[in-house]
Regions:
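Carbohydrate-active catalytic/glycan-binding domains of CAZyme proteins
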Residues: 1-293
Length: 293
């Protein structure tokens, strides 16, 4: 690749109608100062399933194709009329599909596809992400779901593999936390170690960071990250993601969804020591055009 590096942030935003729960783009040259694409309006709309999309992620395949995945959910249209204004209903009676779009050039996009990964007793498919597994030569799609096996109680992390985003393996359980629901998984690698960000719904009611030697092997909690997170109110942050800045440091974004609506959206934290889970909030060094989620 020649020329300047450009960051692309695929996201949604909170709104009073379905225009927020669509595919939005923002770009940056330094990973800190973001500019909206299309004047802050959706780049394109979800027209299938619930006609909205949240928890978006993007992957560049080994062949250079771009894949966008997202949760098939439209809160603005369906929270009241479909789910009777009850969050547990979203986890139990939610969409059984993952929304997907494809592109060769980031400009021309395919029609929306609804990925059917099999029944499996799932009550929802939240926060889908995908990554390439070099040794296996395939892609792992992972997400959070409730399941009929525990009467749609605590959510856990499940995964499915594919080589072409057409044929998928039967979903399997990747991780569950005995005493709590786990949602918003995000895996990434730094050096020889894999890291896993998760939102725990109890003990603690916060984002947690874990480290492991292999992608799907055993992980250990990083207690220093727990101590760092404890300075913030319980259950104010969720949907963690991480990416490298030009200086090589990791930027951790946490979605603030507390009671102050004008503050909702991602808040940036930059690591001073990833190995020990140490981060520093740097909101004053970042710019977001609005509350990106």
């Amino acid at each position: 690749m020649t020329g300047k590096q450009i960051y692309l942030f695929v996201h949604y935003r909170e709104a009073d109608d379905r225009s927020g729960e669509q595919v939005h783009f923002a770009v940056s040259t330094d990973g800190r100062h973001w500019k909206s694409v299309n004047h802050g309006q959706p780049v394109f709309f979800a027209e299938k399933g619930e006609r909205g999309v949240r928890d978006l992620s993007i992957l560049r395949t080994q062949e250079g194709k771009y894949i966008i995945l997202g949760t098939d959910l439209c809160m603005s249209e369906n929270f009241v009329k479909k789910y009777n204004s009850k969050w547990p209903n979203i986890g139990r009676f939610g969409s059984r599909y993952i929304s997907m779009w494809e592109s060769e050039d980031l400009v021309h996009w395919s029609d929306q596809r609804l990925l059917d990964l099999g029944d499996g007793g799932f009550g929802c498919f939240w926060g889908p992400e995908a990554l390439y597994r070099e040794e296996e030569g395939d892609y792992l799609i992972y997400w959070a779901s409730s399941n009929e096996v525990n009467n749609y109680g605590a959510k856990a992390i499940y995964g499915s593999t594919t080589k072409d985003f057409r044929v998928f393996s039967k979903p399997v359980l990747l991780y569950e936390k005995e005493e709590a629901s786990i949602v918003d998984p995000f895996y990434f690698k730094d050096g020889e170690n894999y890291y896993r960000l998760l939102k725990s719904r109890q003990n603690p009611f916060a984002v947690i960071l874990e480290r492991g030697k292999t992608l799907l092997g055993k992980y250990e909690r990083l207690p220093e990250f727990d101590r760092w997170m404890s300075q913030y109110k319980a259950n104010e942050y969720e949907a963690p993601i991480a990416y490298r800045l030009p200086d090589g440091k990791w930027c951790l974004l946490l979605d603030y969804f507390g009671k102050e609506r004008d503050r909702t959206g991602y808040v940036p934290f930059v690591e001073s020591d990833l190995y020990h889970g140490k981060f520093q909030e740097e909101s004053e060094k970042f710019f977001f055009p609005y509350g990106m989620k």
